[in-house]
Amino acid sequence: MLGFDLGRTGYEDAFTLQKQVQAMVQSGGDDILLLLEHPPTVSIGKNSGAENVPPHLQDMWNGHVDIVHSTRGGNVTCHFPGQLVAYPVISLKKRSGGIRAYVHDLEEAAIRMLARFGVTAARRQGFPGVWTGERKIASLGIAVSRYVTMHGMALNVAEDLSLFNIISPCGLEGVAATSIARETAGPVPDMPAVKTAFLEEFYHIFQPAGDHAQPLPTLRTTQDLMTLLQDAQRTEK
């Protein structure tokens, strides 16, 4: 399993990279976890949610927010700097339990990571994502093609959740968003620390049992990912 830190990447650019990585994993490549932040973006999932987007949203944000229609499942959500976005691109062929088990384990990685920073989180019956009480701290929306996942999870880290003042999390009226900064009694971790913690918890859950003797992975760079994709393309030729 390989992990990559893509820094701040636009939604459409990240989607293009995911599709390239997905094709590589479908061809037998290593499972990959992409960690990043998006600029202010409202994404509308396959379950719609367009009705939950104010018609003058871009005017309200002076044009500084992108609105995109996504291939992921779920309703409407938003992304912004200070939110960890995790896009696992992994094969489910050798994992038992199918998509439901995958979603459960992805939530579990977030719950364990949050515990490291003093935030008690859990699942909420009947509602996807990760919650602290009745406040939503992480949203999920995935897609699967030929047994390989893409899209994933958005987990709020920073204090500023102002975009959620306009967009209800996953279209759920009356649901408040929260973040690590709002829930922790200790110092707020920086994004590199959050990314590293999530990578480690994700690895412990998703790495095949026989590979746990291997050292924990470290986050590689966007350039490392581009080199990997170029090498894969040359191999195919």
From Swiss-Prot:
PROSITE patterns: BPL_LPL_CATALYTIC, LIPB. This is Octanoyltransferase. Disulfide bonds: none annotated. Catalyzes the transfer of endogenously produced octanoic acid from octanoyl-acyl-carrier-protein onto the lipoyl domains of lipoate-dependent enzymes. Lipoyl-ACP can also act as a substrate although octanoyl-ACP is likely to be the physiological substrate. In the reaction, the free carboxyl group of octanoic acid is attached via an amide linkage to the epsilon-amino group of a specific lysine residue of lipoyl domains of lipoate-dependent enzymes. The gene is lipB. The lineage of its organism: Bacteria, Pseudomonadati, Thermodesulfobacteriota, Desulfovibrionia, Desulfovibrionales. CDD domains: LipB. One of its GO terms (molecular function) is lipoyl(octanoyl) transferase activity.
